Amino acid sequence: MIVGFNEEELLPACLQSIGFCNDIHYTDLGSTDGSVKIAEQFAQHIYHRAPVPSCEMIQTEVVHYTKNDWVIFIDPDEVVDETLATEIINRFDELTSQPQVGGIKVPWQFYFKRTRLRGTVWGGKNQKFFLVNKHRFAFDPVVHYGRKLKPAFTSTTIALNKGETNVLHHYWMNSWQVFIRKHRRYLINEGIDRYNIGTRTSFKEVLLAPYYEFKRSFWTLKGYKDGILGFFLSAFWAWYQTSAMLSLYKIQQQKALQAK
């Protein structure tokens, strides 16, 4: 499954990298470039939907249209390395044979403007659910928190090889403008989504968030390895998390007043 909007520069590499799949579903969110024509060259199914804040809201629907039990979900700015594709193909039966396994994680390498990130909350040795069983894995319409294993199921992980080549390349952001615009869009629903999944915060936590979130990204998760880029990304992360927590706190206050 893949969801896209005006991604003609990124789509070819992404779709070519999943050429080993036999049932590709592409959903377009109103692209005005050549995205749909590109998708027609690779995808067996194409859908058109109105724009939404995040792709989870589309995947919730489309996952039910897929013919296979095991499904790959990938973003237009992601590319499956040939080494990873070969490993998935060769180990597919082994990886999916256990009845309690609902999802398989793969090594996930972030890039900012084609620069490999070695630290921050995004970079370093990251992992992502990539191949999942649609009967054992949940796709809920919740920004950042909608994709998770169903109760009683576990995951398995494809380990990073010595050459660090068997990765899902994530060409995450190609400009600061796109980076800021996307995260502003995510913030629209971040507070209410956190509230709906049971997350709660306090005024004290909101006040301390800038310090703790910057420290976590820049020092704990080694954002300093990325130099000035790591500093600015960590500062942005601190702002984003603080904004999301403040939104959540305001919603909590509103709900408390309504309950009186």
Predicted regions and their residues:
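Short hydrophobic beta-strand elements that form part
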Residues: M1-I2, H25
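Conserved donor nucleotide-binding strand/loop of the catalytic core
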Residues: V36-Y65, E94
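The conserved acidic donor/metal-binding loop of glycosyltransferases
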Residues: D69, D75-V79
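A conserved acidic beta->alpha catalytic loop
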Residues: S17, D28-I38, P51-V52, D75
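Acidic helix N-cap motif at the loop->helix transition within catalytic regions
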Residues: E9-P12, D33-F42, T83
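Catalytic-site signature of metal-activated, phosphate-bearing donor transferases
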Residues: E56-V63, W70, E82-Q254
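Short, well-ordered alpha-helix to beta-strand connector turns
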Residues: C21-N22, A43, N68
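Short, well-formed alpha-helical segments that are part of the catalytic scaffolds
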Residues: I2-F20
